[in-house]
Amino acid sequence: MAALLMPRRNKGMRTRLGCLSHKSDSCSDFTAILPDKPNRALKRLSTEEATRWAESFDVLLSHKYGVAAFRAFLKTEFSEENLEFWLACEEFKKTRSTAKLVTKAHRIFEEFVDVQAPREVNIDFQTREATRKNMQEPSLTCFDQAQGKVHSLMEKDSYPRFLRSKMYLDLLSQSQRRLS
């Protein structure tokens, strides 16, 4: 499970990305270590990149800093489990080993989908039951319906609030001030 949810547990990364949600002198330029190159040079978030996140929810999800900023926002709303589930499903779809697929599927189900799961996502009864049935023979698509529901929920609910949030607006403002 640790490998599956590693981005959440990487304290150094969380600390550095935490500056996306705080205004302090130490991180007012919104720098973050590249997730694929930890302990290397810092990269600045450009105004263009941050502005593109408003184009669509999928654009936001395709950008590593967009995901980090959205995660920080969701934490303030106590709903980061939705994004964590979506990311876990994306990672799960890359699984090639049948043995690992079954193990990962059960971990994701127990962590996010099952009733009273530690980080239970908000999905309807039919979707939860369909996903439960899919667990009898897990496949790369066993979470597609639940993941789609969570994606829609975030896109229609959390994403518009994120774009209006002080956090996002401050991030845009800070990146624009750097250009001046």
Swiss-Prot record:
InterPro entries: RGS, RGS_RGS8, RGS_sf, RGS_subdom1/3, RGS_subdomain_2. GO terms for cellular component: cytoplasmic side of plasma membrane; dendrite; neuronal cell body membrane; nucleus; perikaryon; synapse. GO terms for biological process: G protein-coupled acetylcholine receptor signaling pathway; G protein-coupled receptor signaling pathway; negative regulation of signal transduction; positive regulation of GTPase activity; regulation of dopamine receptor signaling pathway. Its main location: membrane. GO terms for molecular function: GTPase activator activity. It is found in: Cell membrane; Membrane; Perikaryon; Cell projection, Dendrite. Gene3D superfamilies: 1.10.196.10, Regulator of G-protein Signalling 4, domain 2. Residues 56-171 form the RGS domain. It is a peripheral membrane protein. The modification Phosphoserine is found at residue 26. SUPFAM superfamilies: Regulator of G-protein signaling, RGS. Keywords: Cell membrane, Cell projection, GTPase activation, Membrane, Nucleus, Phosphoprotein, Signal transduction inhibitor. PANTHER family: REGULATOR OF G PROTEIN SIGNALING (PTHR10845), REGULATOR OF G-PROTEIN SIGNALING 8 (PTHR10845:SF147). Regulates G protein-coupled receptor signaling cascades, including signaling via muscarinic acetylcholine receptor CHRM2 and dopamine receptor DRD2. Inhibits signal transduction by increasing the GTPase activity of G protein alpha subunits, thereby driving them into their inactive GDP-bound form. Modulates the activity of potassium channels that are activated in response to DRD2 and CHRM2 signaling. Interacts with GNAO1 and GNAI3. This is Regulator of G-protein signaling 8. It comes from Mus musculus. The gene is Rgs8.
